A protein has these predicted regions:
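Short hydrophobic beta-strand that contains or immediately precedes a catalytic carboxylate
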Residues: 31-33
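Conserved catalytic motifs of the protein kinase core domain
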Residues: 28
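Covalent nucleotidyltransferase core used to form phosphodiester bonds in nucleic acids
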Residues: 45-55
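Long, contiguous domain-sized segments
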Residues: 1-8, 12-24, 42-45, 67-342
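Active-site cofactor/substrate anionic-group-binding motifs, chiefly glycine-
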Residues: 55-68
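Short acidic, Gly/Ser-rich segments with clustered Asp/Glu that frequently serve as metal-coordination loops
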Residues: 35-43
Length: 342
């Protein structure tokens, strides 16, 4: 297994001193991005004696910027969407043309205009082979989930275009960067190959992960590798690829323990998973280990000053990410108001 970083570490890397050195300096992570969606089944429609659910969703994508230790909203999308079965386009039009026309028609409604509300799009879902009601609903929700991911990619592309991201201003995206290829949505955002250069200064940080899928630096599955990770240490960077799912995009993946094991429920709590997409020049050499140490020490210093009461994930929270999540949630329309539209 080829190492995912320039230093060929064989064991955990202690970041305690590096993290202390970074305290008081301006952190290199300046932007924090979080996306979420709320979905609701709002109706049923019938075609050819079959009943299909109508799914409505609110998608929220927020990015906050930290300047001089203060967090401020940088960008926000709130997008209202509907998901309808493909069979609702019975006239043989192309789906994108038909559903774009329906969206336009919907937005002309006096009631929506009065409220100053617009739907961003209507997303067609293909009914699954197993047409049990729950499964149908899942197909509609999956389309809204895909749309949320596309909106996240769009926001990253806008930040890059505006020249906001560089070696002193990384973006932390909440969650994984392992985006599967999309069959629908914007052509230029569908595959990672097309957009990977937008991710030069982006890291993905996951608060939870499947311990079964953990690879050590030799490429072997090894959950104990993380369970035994000492406080403020990171694992060597493993190289991760999945050609059938992610194409020829390679990742550096590593884990950092930000909380002492003795205070957490399980040995995996208090550990975060970090991903970075390898740029072309890093595919042979791996990602610069100094860059990995700097990012990791910065993440250790981001851990929360408090725990959040009932949130079981408190041990894995990073404070600016928590603030960004809270900001996104605060921008949602209330469930009553949203459902009242239908």
């Amino acid at each position: 297994q080829v190492s995912g970083e320039t230093e060929k570490h064989k064991t955990y890397v202690d970041l305690t001193n590096e993290a202390k050195r970074q305290i008081g300096k301006r952190p290199v992570i300046s932007y924090f991005l979080d996306g979420s969606r709320h979905t609701y089944k709002v109706d049923d429609i019938s075609y050819n004696k079959k009943v299909y659910p109508v799914i409505a969703g609110q998608v929220g994508i927020g990015c906050c910027k930290r300047t001089d230790g203060r967090m401020r909203p940088e960008k926000f999308y709130r997008r209202l969407v509907l998901s309808l079965p493909t069979v609702s386009n019975a006239d043989g039009w192309k789906d994108d043309v038909f559903f774009a026309a329906q969206t336009k028609k919907l937005n002309k409604s006096e009631e929506l205009k009065k409220l100053g509300i617009e739907f961003a799009t209507i997303l067609p879902y293909s009914p699954p082979k197993d047409q049990k009601n729950g499964k149908m609903e899942d197909s509609g929700i999956a389309r809204i989930q895909d749309y949320m991911i596309e909106s996240e990619k769009e926001m990253v592309a806008e930040l890059v275009k505006a020249g906001k991201l560089n070696q002193d201003n990384y973006l932390l995206k909440d969650g994984s960067l392992e985006y599967k290829p999309m069959k629908s949505g914007r052509e230029d955002l569908r595959t990672l190959q097309k957009i990977k250069h937008n991710y030069k200064w982006v890291i993905g940080v996951s608060k939870s992960f499947n311990p079964e899928s953990i690879l050590d630096h030799t490429g072997k599955a090894n959950a104990n590798y993380i369970a035994d990770l000492p406080l403020f240490h990171r694992t060597p960077v493993a190289r991760y690829e999945n050609a059938s799912y992610l194409g020829d995009v390679k990742f550096g993946v590593w884990y950092i323990r930000i909380r002492d094991k003795k205070y957490t429920r399980t040995p995996f709590d208090g550990v975060i998973k970090v991903e970075k997409i390898m740029m072309d020049e890093e595919k042979d050499t791996g990602i610069d280990s100094e860059e990995i140490d700097l990012i990791s020490a910065t993440l250790i210093n981001e851990r929360t000053p408090t725990c959040y009461g009932t949130d079981k994930r408190w041990a894995n929270h990073l404070y600016p990410v928590f603030l960004t999540e809270s900001y996104v949630k605060s921008q949602y329309m209330s469930t009553e108001m949203f459902l009242h539209l239908f």
